[in-house]
Amino acid sequence: MKDRYILAFETSCDETSVAVLKNDDELLSNVIASQIESHKRFGGVVPEVASRHHVEVITACIEEALAEAGITEEDVTAVAVTYGPGLVGALLVGLSAAKAFAWAHGLPLIPVNHMAGHLMAAQSVEPLEFPLLALLVSGGHTELVYVSEAGDYKIVGETRDDAVGEAYDKVGRVMGLTYPAGREIDELVHQGQDIYDFPRAMIKEDNLEFSFSGLKSAFINLHHNAEQKGESLSTEDLCASFQAAVMDILMAKTKKALEKYPVKTLVVAGGVAANKGLRERLAAEITDVKVIIPPLRLCGDNAGMIAYASVSEWNKENFAGWDLNAKPSLAFDTME
């Protein structure tokens, strides 16, 4: 049987990434060009800056991904691309490159939901058994997703306001930490103590919804009031207290979801899945189901995860036409 190679593109936010997946399960390359340094001084991603960076490096990323995989353009069997959710300008760069490559070589174009990519990155650890439940935690999303089979996703719970990663960045900015703040907060946690009583919104309510705006506001108010009084607060203790509240919320809702949906596997994915505190809590408290977390290199935005997610779409022959457009607000229930 002839080998099949998927060339995947991911440009939904501030990472330009191109990857090659061989025979559905062997990731040969996963090139990522990060823009973090360009956005640090703004304290967040500037859409126009992100789009321009994508344009500047996308061709080099394609060439590097093919070279690292040891294949040529003629060896590629299909092209996969993120078409949402994300920043519209950033998405369009990846879409344009992917469609141009597919059209030039007469290849099928596979549309992939960015969040499905995060979820299916777990396939790199071991073959997934369905049905399963997934906790997706990133800068833009906090969702509990029930997956009955590969490619069949149903959101059963989500945030009503801020995403968890967004909350990390906002409190990090208040403390003067560098963007993105998640990693630094996670490191400072282990040097501090949980001494500030921050709210755990909706933690006792009988639903699978999340809310982090109250926690964020309480944190900002505490910090602001201390500054007004000339008081000094321990950054380490603030981080420890904030993260303890976040983890209590995530764990409570995840446990409730596992009670409602009795599955054998829990996937935890997205940029925040790299958090040490979250991994420690999962290992200690979720012991009756298998917990699968992608390796650190596949937690952030990358094209490797898009390649993994595209396999089920290819098997269903869910190909896109040349009119495929960016859908910045794409949800699981509105996929192509």
From Swiss-Prot:
InterPro entries: ATPase_NBD, Gcp-like_dom, KAE1/TsaD, Peptidase_M22_CS, TsaD. One of its GO terms (molecular function) is iron ion binding. Its EC number is 2.3.1.234. It catalyses: L-threonylcarbamoyladenylate + adenosine(37) in tRNA = N(6)-L-threonylcarbamoyladenosine(37) in tRNA + AMP + H(+). It comes from the Bacteria. Pfam families: TsaD (PF00814). Keywords: Acyltransferase, Cytoplasm, Iron, Metal-binding, Transferase, tRNA processing. GO terms for biological process: tRNA threonylcarbamoyladenosine modification. PANTHER family: TRNA N6-ADENOSINE THREONYLCARBAMOYLTRANSFERASE, TRNA N6-ADENOSINE THREONYLCARBAMOYLTRANSFERASE, MITOCHONDRIAL. Required for the formation of a threonylcarbamoyl group on adenosine at position 37 (t(6)A37) in tRNAs that read codons beginning with adenine. Is involved in the transfer of the threonylcarbamoyl moiety of threonylcarbamoyl-AMP (TC-AMP) to the N6 group of A37, together with TsaE and TsaB. TsaD likely plays a direct catalytic role in this reaction. This is tRNA N6-adenosine threonylcarbamoyltransferase.
